[in-house]
C-alpha cells in the first residue's frame, strides 16, 4: 500500500511560507537559495617545501560580496597532488580575507594531515569543503593554504585545480 501527502504550502511556526507548489510540480522556496556563485579552474603546478602555511597559488582565490550579513558561503576545491618522497604529509587550510583586511585561517587547527604518503611516487586528489558565515557585506575572498611535514609536495602536478564559491541566502 502506498501513501500520499498532498500539500501546496509548507509554513514554519511563524506562519511564514517556506515551500510552495503551483500544483504542476513546480516548487519555490523562500529559504536556502543560492544568491551568487563563482568558480575557477586552471592548470596548477606548485612545488611546496614550506613547513609554514603558505598560499598554494594566488590564482586559487575566489571572491564574492555578500548580499546580506546573514548570508552563508560554501567554498569547495579539489586538485591533484604528487608526493615523490616517502613519509611526507601535508596540511590544508582555508584562509579568508574580508574587505582587504588580511588573510586569516578560518578552518581550524593543524592536528591532522590532509594527505600523507608512506611510499614514494604517489599521486592522489585533495578536496576541501567549508561552510562559513562571515557576517559582513564587504567583499570576502577565500584561498587554500598548505604546509608540508618534510620534503616536497607538488600541488596540481600539472593537473586541474577546480574551485567553487557559493552564497546561500538567509
What are these regions (language model features)?
Residues 40-55, 63-139, 143-170:
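Terminal beta-strand-rich extracellular "head" domains
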Residues 2-48, 170:
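Glycine-rich, low-complexity segments
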Residues 1, 6-8, 54-55, 121:
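Mixed-charge, polar/low-complexity N-terminal
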Amino acid at each position: 500500500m502506498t501513501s500520499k501527502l498532498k500539500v501546496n504550502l509548507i509554513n514554519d511556526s511563524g506562519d511564514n511560507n517556506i515551500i510552495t507548489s503551483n500544483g504542476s510540480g513546480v516548487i519555490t522556496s523562500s529559504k536556502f537559495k543560492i544568491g551568487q556563485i563563482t568558480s575557477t579552474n586552471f592548470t596548477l603546478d606548485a612545488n611546496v617545501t614550506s613547513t609554514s602555511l603558505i598560499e598554494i597559488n594566488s590564482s586559487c582565490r575566489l571572491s564574492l560580496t555578500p548580499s546580506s550579513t546573514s548570508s552563508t558561503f560554501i567554498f569547495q576545491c579539489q586538485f591533484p597532488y604528487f608526493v615523490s618522497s616517502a613519509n611526507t604529509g601535508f596540511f590544508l587550510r582555508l584562509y579568508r580575507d574580508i574587505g582587504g583586511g588580511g588573510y586569516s585561517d578560518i578552518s581550524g587547527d593543524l592536528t591532522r594531515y590532509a594527505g600523507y604518503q608512506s611510499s614514494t611516487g604517489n599521486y592522489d586528489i585533495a578536496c576541501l569543503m567549508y561552510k562559513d558565515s562571515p557576517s559582513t557585506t564587504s567583499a570576502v575572498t577565500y584561498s587554500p593554504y598548505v604546509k608540508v611535514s618534510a620534503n616536497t609536495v607538488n600541488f596540481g602536478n600539472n593537473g586541474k585545480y577546480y574551485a567553487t564559491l557559493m552564497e546561500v541566502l538567509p
